[in-house]
Amino acid sequence: MKLDGYTRLAAVVANPIKHSISPFIHNRAFEATDTNGAYVAWEIEASDLVETVANIRRYQMFGINLSMPYKEQVIPYLDKLSDEARLIGAVNTVVNENGNLIGYNTDGKGFFKCLPSFTISGKKMTLLGAGGAAKSILAQAILDGVSQISVFVRSVSMEKTRPYLDKLQEQTGFKVDLCALEYVSELQARIAESDLLVNATSVGMDGQSSPVPENIVLPETLLVADIIYQPFETPFLKWARSQGNPAVNGLGMLLYQAAEAFQLWTGKEMPTEEIWQSLTEKYQ
């Protein structure tokens, strides 16, 4: 990697963040595209966020990525938000456009780009969970022309989830159906008519649990996706594949959301195939 007086910085900002594989992805991309840049991980306290954002301008950085807990906290310090960032209410990428700081959320775009030969326009989706990743997938699906979305959460989370879905409807005119995960017959009915089933919960990270009962029957044409990438094959994906359904883990989402950010910063396409090969060797 070339480092000199002209090298521009990018960083991922969160707490904790030292475990992040974003530096691996972006530094490979800088090198492969002959871009004079370097990408680092900054683990900061909340009290340092304002100064961190100021440093984007001060050091003429490409910009930053953000992870928890700063995706929402950063918004007041930005000059402008993209459509999807405004809908989601969270930012994962800040772009420095000649001193103007613009907030984007590339998670949803990254998710849909990682699905092989699939477009969400006119399709039906069942989504498990309503956290940060789920919100980004929801908003992007609406922007991309999805025809129906059924969101399933635990009954104790229904009250907390509804205000965000109401806000989405106010802003887009699109009504999302909210259902309790405990109602298995309703879950089965919604999955049966869906084109895409997504686990956007953390259930399965232990390598043992699954967010849905194993007696659920999947339609033959259903594509199944999990936002988790460690383990590489969750019990949820294993179960879907055992029924003969195509299934995709979360590593592609991580790569393609990074590729979206990289293009916003540099104007260049990330060599995703080359980096995907390196990632699968590292995590499979």
UniProtKB/Swiss-Prot annotation:
InterPro entries reported for this sequence: Aminoacid_DH-like_N_sf, NAD(P)-bd_dom_sf, SDH_C, Shikimate_DH, Shikimate_DH-bd_N, Shikimate_DH_fam
Alphabetic keyword roster: Amino-acid biosynthesis, Aromatic amino acid biosynthesis, NADP, Oxidoreductase
GO biological process: amino acid biosynthetic process; aromatic amino acid family biosynthetic process; chorismate biosynthetic process; shikimate metabolic process
Positions annotated to bind shikimate: 20-22, 67, 92, 107, 229
Top-level enzyme category: oxidoreductase
Gene3D superfamilies the UniProt entry points to: Leucine Dehydrogenase, chain A, domain 1, NAD(P)-binding Rossmann-like Domain
Function: Involved in the biosynthesis of the chorismate, which leads to the biosynthesis of aromatic amino acids. Catalyzes the reversible NADPH linked reduction of 3-dehydroshikimate (DHSA) to yield shikimate (SA).
Family recorded in the similarity comment: Belongs to the shikimate dehydrogenase family.
Protein name: Shikimate dehydrogenase (NADP(+))
